[in-house]
Curated annotation (Swiss-Prot):
SUPFAM superfamilies: Obg GTP-binding protein N-terminal domain, P-loop containing nucleoside triphosphate hydrolases. It is an enzyme of class 3 (hydrolase). PANTHER family: DEVELOPMENTALLY REGULATED GTP-BINDING PROTEIN-RELATED (PTHR11702), MITOCHONDRIAL RIBOSOME-ASSOCIATED GTPASE 2 (PTHR11702:SF31). GO terms for cellular component: cytoplasm. It is found in: Cytoplasm. GO terms for biological process: ribosome biogenesis. The gene is obg. This is GTPase Obg. Its EC number is 3.6.5.-. Residues 128-147 are annotated as: Disordered. It comes from Burkholderia multivorans (strain ATCC 17616 / 249). One of its GO terms (molecular function) is GTPase activity. Its cofactor is Mg(2+). Keywords: Cytoplasm, GTP-binding, Hydrolase, Magnesium, Metal-binding, Nucleotide-binding. Monomer.
Amino acid sequence: MKFIDEARIEVIAGDGGDGSASMRREKFVPFGGPDGGDGGRGGSVYAIADRNINTLIDYRYAKKHLARNGENGRGSDCYGKGGDDITLRMPVGTVITDMDTGELIADLTEHDQQVLLAKGGAGGLGNLHFKSSTNRAPRQKTDGKPGERRMLKLELKVLADVGLLGMPNAGKSTFISSVSNAKPKIADYPFTTLAPNLGVVRVGPSKSFVIADIPGLIEGAAEGAGLGHQFLRHLQRTGLLLHLVDIAPFDEGVDPVAEATAIVGELRKYDEALYEKPRWLVLNKLDMVPEDERAARVADFLERFDWHGPVFEISALTGQGCEALCYAIYDYLAEHSDAHRAAEAEDLAADVRFRDAPPAANAAPGDDA
């Protein structure tokens, strides 16, 4: 299935039905009085998170979603039927934003999480409501209210614990296929990976974490060069970044230090918060370096790159060093997961784009407004 991580849709809630101005007409009841019923409420549009969906491709082609209008009220105290609600199922990790106001409507982070996108209009009042001691036969009634109409932007940010960074052909896909159940396309040319891949790494019974591989970055990615800039958003939810560097490039004219520096620069240009995330350096393709040269090459790289954080030496192809790296990742995540969740919750709470949702925002489909 094609991976689509962004879409724009229009949601239109149903209009409320009009109230009825009707009088009771019955034999032997000369002054029956008003009996006009209210109009039905318009249908609302909801979104619900579904962990069984992993792409927004359905919304790339179905751009308009309309709920039904409420029926008009009728005589004999007959109220109009409410319009049916519609529910749009979206992948877990979808961020929904109002394109006109910039308002952040929802961040779907849990399976079955439900949010109101567009509220149906209230039904109009029948003339029954306008009866009084001075107006025994009212002719007044009100029309139904229009439903909400919104243009929405949907962005999918995959939920992963660890994100992989690196130039094209740094060995990211080989690494994720080596340590997880993911089976990405692997080849000896750049940009083999065209969409994010997720893999589950298991280090023991009930001990696992999710790792995300995005297309490789190149210099200028933050300005739109290459493919990686389209997918950097998928790293924003991760708790740890692994920066993979090809320590033994096939082209002798390529400097691994310059490439690693360019990646860090692009990360900072795109998002300062992403740049500040915990990041580990992983020197890959160690099997391509003669054993007697490895220590010197690694030391030279670290000195010129001026790196003082965690560093791991691996060969994704042979598996050398991968097991130790995975155990270290799991231990780190287990130690810092609570702090990471707390930081995410704090960021969401501080996001001024979140609206003060009315109580109806959490109502279940079909509840009367």
